[in-house]
Amino acid sequence: MEVPEDVKRRLTLPFEENFFAGHTACQGCGASLGLRYVLKAYGRKTILVIPACCSTIIAGPWPYSALNANLFHTAFETTGAVISGIEAALKALGYKVKGEDGIMVVGWAGDGGTADIGLQALSGFLERGHDALYIMYDNEAYMNTGIQRSSSTPYGAWTTNTPGGKRHFLEKRHKKKVIDIVIAHRIPYAATASVAYPEDFLRKLKKAQKIPGPSFIQLFAPCPTGWRAPTDKTIEIARLAVQTAYFPLFEYENGKYKINMPNPKKEPKPIEEFLKLQGRFKYMTKEDIEVLQKWVLEEWERLKKLAEVFG
């Protein structure tokens, strides 16, 4: 597609669109933004594997699809196994996988289908060393089935099975560190990314394409519906998650950590700035907020030390 010169000068993302209008995502959906960026990075030479999740519905009902790519729907827990099988089959048939001119096999699964139900298959994919990319789009609950908590749901959050109010059954466990579990497999490349920083996400997608072996990206993707947030605040919320160090951006490449924060020398903003835009946190007490703030800063300090020692 020919890009006008005046447009080209302003572009920081690829011009070509492979995620079309007519999809069924909710307004402000962070996952649909992320999927759009993936297809901008890799184009039509992509095989997407999507399990049961919001994105299964977003793509559209058969025989229609909003995705201009090869698409394989699979069972909830099997993303890691299916991308492993597709990669092995492509190689057996003589196709090049990964690299600039290779086919990109991409698993695209939510936090429930990754951190919980699909964790075993993810581990197998990583351990076997397949040339594919697994992306966990993290909206911090089982949104497609009715906003139930997952192990990626943060401390203090309301969900339909951790309700707030008088009985105060809010989530009392901290968010599972899936990226740490992945890094424990000592794969060549793993990273965190956010829909609020698309240039950073695109750069990491391109790096995952070039590096042989399994790659993993944990993508922060707000869900206004499940987070009880205004639909026009998706990017602001995602940006605040990074600026408060609740969801720091970093890379792990061949044993080395590198922090990718937009303002690395700036102190994190108070966690309240992230929380106050979301109705799911409205039942948190002052003590709850202090607990979450303490955890966020402890994890941020731990990451900085990892980057200092293994950078």
Swiss-Prot record:
InterPro entries listed in its UniProt record: PorB-like (IPR051479), THDP-binding (IPR029061), TPP_enzyme_TPP-bd (IPR011766)
Known catalytic reactions: 3-methyl-2-oxobutanoate + 2 oxidized [2Fe-2S]-[ferredoxin] + CoA = 2-methylpropanoyl-CoA + 2 reduced [2Fe-2S]-[ferredoxin] + CO2 + H(+)
A GO molecular-function descriptor: 3-methyl-2-oxobutanoate dehydrogenase (ferredoxin) activity
Biological process terms in GO annotation: organic acid metabolic process; sulfur compound biosynthetic process
Description of how the protein assembles with itself and partners: Heterotetramer of one alpha, one beta, one delta and one gamma chain.
Keywords: Oxidoreductase
UniProt cross-references to PANTHER family, sorted A to Z: PYRUVATE SYNTHASE SUBUNIT PORB (PTHR42897:SF2)
Enzyme class: oxidoreductase
Coiled-coil intervals: none
Keyword Oxidoreductase attributed: yes
A Pfam entry, by short name: TPP_enzyme_C
Organism domain of life: Archaea
Full protein name: Ketoisovalerate oxidoreductase subunit VorB
Provenance organism: Pyrococcus abyssi (strain GE5 / Orsay)
EC number: 1.2.7.7
Keyword Oxidoreductase listed: yes
UniProt cross-references to CDD domains, sorted A to Z: TPP_PFOR_porB_like
